[in-house]
Design a protein with these regions (language model features):
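Flexible, acidic/Gly-rich N-terminal and inter-domain linker regions that tether
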Residues: 1-108
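Conserved Radical SAM active-site core
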Residues: 97-114, 119-162
């Protein structure tokens, strides 16, 4: 299954121009790209089936040619001290990453992972145990923000990349 996924186009990682070009290459009109972009980056849907203003026929074309990366929330730990939330997300390839939400008076800040593992070798950090495995796709980084925002039902105002 992983080999099949690698052949599909990761549309959450695309900017608007790239998405427009891709949608046109699939035989659809240009305006569809804007609709799909809004479903992904404004409404934060996790599957093509949630895109209710896209025809079922074109949804199937998308499923045949693209992948919509959506992280799976495995665990959330909440600090009793200050309410900080640590998230563990599973990636499609079986790896896991961590993200952290910190709530402040001025807004919600998240620290997102940019890679699986780390080569720094810090003794206190579990991320370094297996070394650096790989960098994350843009979609995997973006979806950390989207999933945390959906989890708390609030806007994320600041992002720190780890």
């Amino acid at each position: 299954m992983e080999q099949i996924k690698e052949q599909l186009t990761d549309i959450k990682s695309m900017n608007m121009d790239e998405l427009t070009e891709f949608i046109i290459s699939l035989g659809e009109k240009k305006f569809r790209a804007k609709q799909i972009y809004e479903w992904i980056h404004v409404k934060h849907v996790d599957s093509f089936d949630e895109m209710t203003n896209i025809s079922k026929k074109f949804i199937q074309v998308l499923k045949d040619n693209a992948i919509l990366i959506s992280l799976k929330k495995e665990e959330v730990q909440v600090s009793k001290l200050d309410g900080t939330r640590k998230y563990l997300f599973a990636l499609d390839d079986g790896n896991v990453i961590e993200s952290v939400l910190m709530k402040y008076k001025h807004g919600n800040s998240v620290c997102i992972s940019s890679q699986v593992g780390c080569r720094m070798g810090c003794r206190f950090c579990a991320s370094t145990l297996d070394g650096l495995v790989r960098g994350l796709r843009p979609s995997e980084m973006i979806d950390q923000i989207y999933q945390i925002g959906k989890d708390i039902g609030e806007r994320i105002s600041n992002v720190v990349v780890m």
